[in-house]
Amino acid sequence: MSAVVFSADFSSERQWVAGRSWAYPDGGPTNQGDNKLDHLTADSAYSRLGTFRARRRADGLWDAGLLTTEGSAEGFMVRTGDHLETTVRLPTELGAWPAIWTWRDGGNEVDVFEYHPDNPDLLELTNHVRRGQSYVRREGVRPGAVIDLGVTFGRRSVVWTLDGERIFADGRGVGSGWQAYLIVNLSVCAGRYHPAPEPETVEMSYEVRRLLVTRPLGGYLTDDDPPEVDWPVHGPAEEG
């Protein structure tokens, strides 16, 4: 049994801080060392309606939307054993780099997903805490598609699902004491690893229609993860 402990209201300033994150050098607004053209903005039009936007600036960077629970009044953190579910509409423009991920104290990063439209059918799923990763290709993943993603942050294995199907279990997990803040954002690629936006593109977006986190009632009573968290690594995940 589990209970909902977080249901995203992107308009809530108690839940979310807009336009800055300590995952960026000095809290932002730029992170060009990570091949990003982002110039983070707190303008509500870029994130607070659940549509995360980026618009080209005269200086070559892009005003970009980012929300994080870090520094908010509620300060919500996901922790070991939590399960996150989200519904997103993927972007269509080359150079768009949407992501939902976690961060705390210079690390604790797990990428719920990253996506690049130049690899139209591929999702990037990464556990940076213990170095588990998969590149998963699916026919239902494509620019503009609406997909349901789930992640269970298990002690011994982080498990991802797509539209209800398990697609990857990393067999590494996040450990027993892990916790981290949520980040939802749209970055813009600078061209090193994926194409930069085409010259005629001036705006891009993706949509997060739903995001919630559930937690086992009463926590874990033993040192073992529940069975659904400890799925084996083998399965339909495809390494790319």
Regions found by a protein language model. Give the residues of each.
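Low-complexity, Ser/Thr/Pro/Gly-rich disordered linker/stalk regions
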Residues: 1-82, 212-240
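Secretory/extracellular carbohydrate-interaction modules
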Residues: 52-122
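Short beta-strand segments enriched in hydrophobic/aromatic residues
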Residues: 54-58, 90, 153, 188, ...
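Short, aromatic/His-centered strand-loop micro-motif at the edge of beta-sheets
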Residues: 126-148
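Short strand-turn-strand beta-turns centered on an Asx-Gly dipeptide
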Residues: 161-165
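Ligand-recognition surfaces built from glycine- and aromatic
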Residues: 174-240
